């Protein structure tokens, strides 16, 4: 099981949240377009109400792959293959059962669903290259809003 709840998933993987820049979008749309490093990707936002503001954002990027290779010949990279599909290549920095965190220039949490004839699950330190199934997802980390302390002068 990849997740029991959105909140549980965010709590488990928030340490691997990526920093990016979200672009403006239609109000209420779950499709989030975000620049991660030098790549612009479209992700399905799982942490409604789908109101992540345009501008700087922290998010857990998540995809599921059924096939992968243990190959790092091209180095770390993240590429968009189409709406909500990613090509991920990089070093595995953490593994928890069948979920790995890949350093693809930005952290990407990838759920691996192994095929009977596929390679074994990678371990931390291994290189992996995979293509995620659609839809790749974004779990936006909502930072608490810090309000300035009102001064007596503000009340005049």
Q: Where are these predicted regions, by residue range?
A:
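Residue-level recognition of conserved beta-strand positions in structured domain cores
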Residues: 45, 61, 103-104, 112, ...
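Beta-strand elements of well-folded, non-transmembrane domains
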Residues: 63-65, 92, 136
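Short loop/beta submotifs within extracellular cysteine-rich repeat domains
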Residues: 39-42, 67-69, 108-111, 137-140
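Structural detector for short beta-strands of small beta-barrel domains
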Residues: 1-27, 78-98, 128-130, 156
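Mixed-charge, glycine-accented linear interaction segment located at domain edges/termini
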Residues: 109-156
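Beta-strand secondary-structure signal
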Residues: 31-33, 58-60, 89, 101, ...
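Short, solvent-exposed interaction modules
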Residues: 67-122
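Acidic (E/D-rich), amphipathic helical modules within compact regulatory domains
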Residues: 27-75, 81
């Amino acid at each position: 099981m990849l997740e029991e709840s959105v909140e549980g998933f965010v709590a488990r993987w928030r340490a691997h949240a990526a920093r990016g820049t979200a672009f403006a979008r239609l109000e209420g749309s779950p499709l989030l377009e975000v620049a991660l490093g030098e790549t612009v990707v479209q992700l399905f936002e799982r942490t409604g109400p789908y109101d992540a503001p345009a501008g700087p954002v922290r998010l857990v990027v998540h995809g599921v792959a059924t096939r992968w290779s243990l190959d790092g010949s091209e180095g770390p990279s993240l590429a968009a293959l189409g709406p909500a599909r990613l090509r991920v290549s990089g070093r595995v920095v953490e593994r928890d059962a069948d979920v790995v965190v890949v350093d693809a220039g930005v952290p990407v949490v990838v759920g691996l669903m192994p095929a009977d004839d596929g390679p074994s699950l990678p371990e931390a330190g291994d290189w992996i290259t995979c293509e995620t199934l659609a839809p790749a997802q974004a779990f936006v980390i909502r930072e608490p809003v810090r309000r300035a302390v009102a001064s007596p002068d503000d009340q005049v």
